[in-house]
Amino acid sequence: MKMNHKDFFTVSNLLSVLRLFLAVPLWLLFDNYNSSATVHYWIFALCIFAAITDILDGFLARKLNQVTEAGKIIDPLADKIAMAVVVIRLAMLGELPFYYLSLIVVRDLFIFLGGIYVTNKIGKVLPSNILGKATVLIIGIVVLLTLLQIDKNSLLFNIFYYFSIIMIVLSFIAYVIRANEYLQRKKLV
């Protein structure tokens, strides 16, 4: 897989890089998480902004015909880092359990490292699939409900929380199956 600077400097990739940089103010804002509700709203607003940039970068990449190998790496990496920052900080504050954080981190780490392995073997980056995107969306909803301080015992919170756990496991299994299929196809060529 060969990339050049034109492959990197696209509108959609720059939006993904912006999302990467949002991790810093998100991390820092959590230092004052318990000081006021205003901080919750700032974190919430940055999370919504990150979600909007995620939607926009994919839309613009397709619309402007700027789908690049670099973008296939940067976009999910930005998603994983931004999500990890928020979930790590929420777990550190006791707002989300550490096993939930562990599930997300282990899944994302295996998918990332597996993606590097598959890319090296087949010579191209596997794009994200709909199940992975849906999983990030559901985890994002759990994060937003947590930031809005929705009661953890409420039906609304529990539906999204337990559904996200199911999605984390299913999307991991789907990624393993998909990677294996690509590797098997490569052996047949």
Model-derived features: positions:
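Alpha-helical transmembrane bundles and membrane-interface segments of multipass inner-membrane proteins
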Residues: M1-V189
